[in-house]
Amino acid sequence: MQRMIIRQNSATAEEIASHLRACDDVFVRALEQRVEIVAYADKIARLAHCIEGWRDERLVGLVAAYFNAQTRIAFITNVSVLAEAQGIGSGGILLEQCIAKMQTLGATEIRLEVEESNQVARYFYLKHAFIQSGMSGNILQMIRHCETRT
């Protein structure tokens, strides 16, 4: 198996949509039940900072975050890794690279949301220094405070 190559902001909206569809059964609640994937992929491609994992020219992992320079708050909108690339640290590598990028941009905090019932994802985020900051229905809000880097 080829090693994962990490790129930033290189995936097209079509590649992102294809990746999200391929990951749909990995999510606790199917992504297609929550968003319109083509529109979501287009928004990510246009507005998010994307840290991408590629293997054999196929997008196997994606962490996408929006950054508001005025508030210095980043929001991770997507963390997804194909089943074939899970369990070998791919998601952690991509998440840490995203955190580093947000800190370089000046983020003082990084936020994300996760389904309360998704124990695997919750543990993953706790392992990466995110803490619970609130609840909205069955959605757990998490935050990581950052040291800014320049």
Report the location of each language-model feature.
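Base-recognition residues in the alpha-helical recognition helix of bacterial helix-turn-helix
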Residues: 78, 86, 114
